[in-house]
């Protein structure tokens, strides 16, 4: 894991990086699932502390990110993806809205490290849990990050069938 820090920097998103985040999101997700620029700009503006970026040290290029909003709800619904007004900075739960890493940078542990950093920060902030939805093919990956599969989600974002997963932050090591 140490070598990941030799190549990459992990940090909070900066103002003006929404366009780059949308380009990454568009490369990683089909059009029916990807976030659009006006909404990404709102996420960057309203919840930057819940937006972790991976950047190449040598080039300064953003290569991936994890973003979320906070709420007092404990289940992810489709409206969280499009309505930033649902973000409650004091919320006890975070809803992970996107985990995206450019394809040429995958399988190095970047998503896991961005998630680890976000979850540790939110645990320290007193939040109870993180919730996400994922396709069946990603369930095992998220289990390795400490998530528990709750079964099929109420979310039908993008017309897909999703698994809802939760990570209880106070149980994290």
Predicted regions and their residues:
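Cytosolic beta-strand hydrophobic patch enriched in CBS
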Residues: 51-56
């Amino acid at each position: 894991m140490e070598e990941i820090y030799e190549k990459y920097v992990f940090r909070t998103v900066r103002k003006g990086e929404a366009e780059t985040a949308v380009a990454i999101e568009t490369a990683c997700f089909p059009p029916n699932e990807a976030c659009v620029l006006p909404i990404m700009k709102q996420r960057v503006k309203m919840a930057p502390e819940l937006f972790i970026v991976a950047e190449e040290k040598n080039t300064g290029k953003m290569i991936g990110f994890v973003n979320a909003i906070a709420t007092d709800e404990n289940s992810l619904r489709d409206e969280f993806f499009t309505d930033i007004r649902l973000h409650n900075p004091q919320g006890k739960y975070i809803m992970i809205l996107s985990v995206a890493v450019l394809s040429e940078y995958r399988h190095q542990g970047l998503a896991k490290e961005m998630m680890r950093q976000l979850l540790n920060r939110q645990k320290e902030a007193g939040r109870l849990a993180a919730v996400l939805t994922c396709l069946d093919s990603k369930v095992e990956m998220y289990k390795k990050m400490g998530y528990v599969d709750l079964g099929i989600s109420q979310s039908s974002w993008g017309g897909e069938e999703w698994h809802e997963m939760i990570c209880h932050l106070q149980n994290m090591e």
